[in-house]
């Protein structure tokens, strides 16, 4: 083997070895932290609901025009006897579309929904409680430059009178954590 050929072969082997190692290192990196899940603790969720939810999980639901990240707890499972109402919290950073909360505040509540302003939750907050279509409670909060959207739905046998205080308590807990510069 000539020195030139040996050098080329050695370069090829080293390149393949180093590239594979670098790719493997890239795969071992931790995924970026989801900013939605830390907005609520398991203890806060269990205290507000009186149920044992366990940890929430980040989920990519294609956040739509406003972006953001979502964390979900509960929901429909394989065993209906163990189903818990679904609770979701979305952290929405500032974006080109403006405030998610202000956008929805400018719209009328949906058919079968009532709207109530919340005081002492973030800079601006309101709750929509819907009995008919999409039965559940939605809380919209503007806190600093960010928005929080909290949903309690898939209520199974629980009434809105159970869901609304749960949603408001969780929004009160999440709002200060979502306020970031």
Language-model segments: residues:
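Short, Lys/Arg-rich flexible segments
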Residues: 25-63, 87, 165-181
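N-terminal secretory signal peptides that target proteins for export/translocation
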Residues: 1-4
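A short, solvent-exposed beta-edge/loop patch
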Residues: 26-32, 112-181
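Exposed alpha-helical structural elements
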Residues: 44, 99-103, 162, 166
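Secreted/processed peptides and extracellular or luminal domains of membrane proteins
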Residues: 42-43, 77, 119, 136
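Functionally engaged cysteine thiol sites
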Residues: 37-38, 42, 69-71, 113, ...
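Short, solvent-exposed recognition patches
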Residues: 52-131
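Bacterial N-terminal signal peptides
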Residues: 7-20
